[in-house]
Amino acid sequence: MQYRKARLDEVQEVAQVCADAFEDYPYLSMIASNLKNPEQYKEFVLALQEVLVRLAIKQDSCLVAEKDGRIVAAAILQHQTISMLNYLQNGATKLFSFISITKLFKYFNFVEESERHLEDSAEYDWYLMMLAVTPYYQRKGIGSLFLLEGVEPFVRSTGGHSLGLITNRDYNVPF
């Protein structure tokens, strides 16, 4: 397995890995009923991931894991607060074709509040916003290996000592 920072020319590929991995994730699926056309949920998830991946790549905080030359996992890390302006500058306006601006901002605020709870309850240098593994490789140890051999060394290389994360899936806890 090879680990490295993602490149801007890989936004679509990395976003697809994230979208495939998180399509049924509760944080995302709860927004489906708020879409203008709920049947466009998959397209919305992909567009949202493109925004997040593009922003993370520009901040040098998107890592990928490659197996046999294919990206099979991605990690989006956060070291600083991301403003709504950052999202808008990285394509969030594209999301308005799927959801009203009010509902999208409510969703972003919900996610931000969840992250704020983590900030208030623990100290950490980096926040693992997302660890996505393509469905074929899920629950085969790829995510754990990526954390140990890719994400941890990256955090240490920046002078970081701790990593915070949130999950609402029991099977994600023991890595």
What is the predicted role of each segment?
Residues 134, 168:
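Residue-level recognition of the GNAT/N-acetyltransferase active site
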Residues 133, 139-153:
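Conserved acetyl-CoA-binding loop-helix of GNAT-fold acetyltransferases
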